């Protein structure tokens, strides 16, 4: 956990190599600019199911797609100010075995995040996202267990924020946080463009979504200077000393 409450450390668990950019790029950039440590774990490259643009290129191979996705996601993370690693677990379907779970637990204990960002629990369009959500909760639980690996320190009560899915209306997504990302939206756009070779059609979609969520943030009490926002749903209660 961060020693400074003003700069909570952030760990992002992303099912595919681009998910963190579209859905949490603003949060990552904002946190990094404020001095927080931000680390991204990509469970897969999204090489089979989320690299449409690359597969349209003549002579493309699976290994070339994976390498390209690694390069693109690494470039995007650099723009956002985050570090990144890839577990290469495959996609469509994603499979997380015991060794991968142990690795994620180790990352959590090493990184000691105050906040975890990941997918929603139920995305009927993409079951890889569901597994990423369940894996995040499972490994968080294990990382908190005092009897697990006594050579490392147990994780504290890190909040899990679920970022907005592509089809929120059918995923049961009920946001309770609209995060103002206006100061870093240009960085999010730059990071999204780094991924555009595989999924270029999503750049405009998530640009428009940022504007819509910004309008909703103002409607819900944010200053009128807010132009862009990202939506999140908390998994656990927040703790406070006042009603607000």
Annotate each predicted stretch with a short phrase.
Residues 1-13, 34, 83, 93-244:
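Metal-dependent de-N-acetylase/amidase catalytic core
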Residues 1-111, 241-242:
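Active-site rim/loop-helix segments in enzyme catalytic domains that contact anionic ligands
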């Amino acid at each position: 956990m961060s020693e400074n409450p003003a700069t909570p450390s952030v760990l992002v668990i992303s099912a595919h190599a681009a998910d963190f950019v579209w859905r949490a790029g603003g949060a990552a950039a904002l946190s990094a600019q404020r001095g927080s440590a931000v680390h991204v774990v990509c469970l897969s490259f999204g090489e089979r199911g989320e690299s449409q643009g690359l597969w349209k290129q003549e002579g493309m191979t699976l290994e070339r797609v994976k390498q390209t996705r690694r390069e693109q996601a690494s470039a995007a993370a650099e723009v956002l100010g985050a570090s990144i690693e890839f577990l290469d677990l495959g996609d469509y379907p994603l499979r997380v075995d015991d060794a991968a779970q142990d690795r994620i637990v180790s990352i959590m204990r090493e990184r000691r995040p105050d906040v975890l960002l990941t997918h929603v629990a139920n995305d009927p369009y993409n079951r890889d996202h569901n597994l990423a959500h369940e894996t995040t909760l499972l490994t968080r639980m294990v990382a908190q267990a005092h009897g697990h690996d006594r050579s490392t320190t147990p994780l504290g009560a890190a909040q899990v924020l679920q970022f907005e899915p592509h089809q929120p209306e059918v995923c049961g997504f009920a946001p309770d946080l609209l995060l103002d990302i206006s100061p870093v939206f240009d960085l999010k756009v730059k990071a999204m463009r780094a991924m555009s070779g595989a999924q270029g059609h999503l750049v405009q979609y998530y640009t428009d979504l940022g504007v819509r969520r910004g309008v909703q943030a103002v409607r819900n009490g944010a200053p009128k200077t807010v132009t862009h926002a990202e939506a999140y749903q908390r998994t656990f209660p927040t703790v406070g000393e006042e009603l607000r």
